[in-house]
Amino acid sequence: MPIEFIATSKLPTAFGEFNISVFQDPVTGEEHVALSKGLENPPTDPVLVRVHSECLTGDAFASLKCDCGPQLQATQKLINEAGQGVILYLRQEGRGIGLTNKIRAYALQDQGHDTVDANLLLNLPADARRYDMCSIMLDHLKVKEVKLITNNPLKIQALKDQGINVVDRVPLTVGRNPFNEQYLKTKRERMAHLYQKDDF
């Protein structure tokens, strides 16, 4: 996807000061964000990176149905403590199916279906996300080698397929609560996420 760098600014946050950069698809107008720290000069060592898909309910409204909000906040803390890193915040709500369909899927989950089956019952893929914009964003930041903060092996492979050297995986297990235990188990059992059994 031919996204283009548009704008950048400093962004003070509750977790430290970052730089926020916006990238845009010139055809669709879709915007993605890189939240970075300590990358004023090209890095010489592998950089902490998280690829985080937009989750309005979790990131903005602190929903307990997922672990997205806690993952985002934990990553900001981790990067701030390390002094260097980047969050690629991709505008792919609901694993790429959009907000409306995500809420429809939530309604099916309320009836007892898991997160995978809920999407399939709506004739939608379990995961419709794309990651082809990541290499362009990381290249703009001069990041060539990454320590990927993820539990999702698909993200690791997606970055490798784009020529990004993923030298390590940093597990991220936060945000478990009674409302999302089944969701997390489904991600491990049906979506191959790299949680450990004792995480649950």
From Swiss-Prot:
Which residue positions are annotated as catalytic?
Answer: 127 (proton acceptor), 129 (nucleophile)
> Which Gene Ontology BP terms does the record give?
riboflavin biosynthetic process
As given in the record, the signal peptide range reads: none
Which GO MF terms does the UniProt record name? GTP binding; GTP cyclohydrolase II activity; zinc ion binding
E.C. designation(s):
3.5.4.25
Task: Tell me the residue numbers annotated for binding Zn(2+).
Answer: 55, 66, 68
Quote the record's binding site residues for GTP: 50-54, 71, 93-95, 115, 150, 155
Task: Tell me the pathway.
Answer: Cofactor biosynthesis; riboflavin biosynthesis; 5-amino-6-(D-ribitylamino)uracil from GTP: step 1/4
Cofactor(s) recorded for this entry are:
Zn(2+)
GO cellular component terms listed in the entry, alphabetical order? cytosol
What domain of life is recorded for the organism? Bacteria
Q: Which InterPro entries match?
A: GTP_cyclohydro_II, RibA, RibA-like_sf
Paste the cofactor note.
Answer: Binds 1 zinc ion per subunit.
Question: Record's family?
Answer: Belongs to the GTP cyclohydrolase II family.
What's this chain's function?
Catalyzes the conversion of GTP to 2,5-diamino-6-ribosylamino-4(3H)-pyrimidinone 5'-phosphate (DARP), formate and pyrophosphate.
| Protein name, per record | GTP cyclohydrolase-2
